[in-house]
């Protein structure tokens, strides 16, 4: 069941389900609990899962100011949510934006993190590349000015994206279904704001992470394999797996859940 909590200037939608060790699942940019339902339900077979819609995503109320989308803000939201539900310590797992948010909390409050799983990182702690920042900004502006159809049209103008969608047309349908779960102005602001924010900022030190870390790299334009490899090198003792990209969603989810379960069992 969805609950809502006001944390300063934003309100988050969240839920807790399943049974077993406590695990926090953090979705990626442009996703939400509904979009990650298969992952959340799979994890809930082995863990007590706290999942939430990040600020401005999904059922969380809109946040339309792009300046309010930073990793410092996302981390503050997550720490506030954990305080509210009374979780002092848990396994942290997340994809892309969610993985970077979880890693930031692991640097800010290391005692809170029992184990850390970073899936499909987009960078090794830096903001996105200038090209990706531009592409995300143009995508956000397309949503603002022309809605979802304009956004799809812009995506298809990017050669790498057009090739990927041509090889798997179902991905385009899934993306459209994902986007319509959000307030358009809110997700446009998120697409512009987050890529320009760096998870690893001055004052933070990856060496402060005390939890065991597993890195699951991606293998696409936004989440290049090299980024995952760089993250694994950056964090002392981190374990690196092979990417799951290129397989059907059902198989990808099954592999992700099994990999997380096995890693947590080991630590």
Describe the function of each predicted region.
Residues 7-62:
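Conserved HGGG/HGGXW glycine-rich cap/lid loop of the alpha/beta-hydrolase fold
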Residues 41, 50-93:
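Active-site loop/oxyanion-hole signature of alpha/beta-hydrolase fold enzymes
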Residues 94-98, 102:
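Gly/Ala-rich beta-loop-alpha elbow adjacent to hydrolase catalytic centers
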Residues 103, 107-108, 112-145:
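Flexible "cap/lid" loop of the alpha/beta hydrolase fold
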Residues 127-129, 145-196:
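Conserved alpha/beta-hydrolase catalytic His-Asp/Glu region
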Residues 209, 215-217:
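Short beta-strand/loop motif that positions the catalytic acidic residue
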Residues 221-227:
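Conserved alpha/beta-hydrolase "acid-adjacent" motif
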Residues 237-267:
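Catalytic active-site module of serine/aspartate enzymes centered on a nucleophile-bearing elbow/loop
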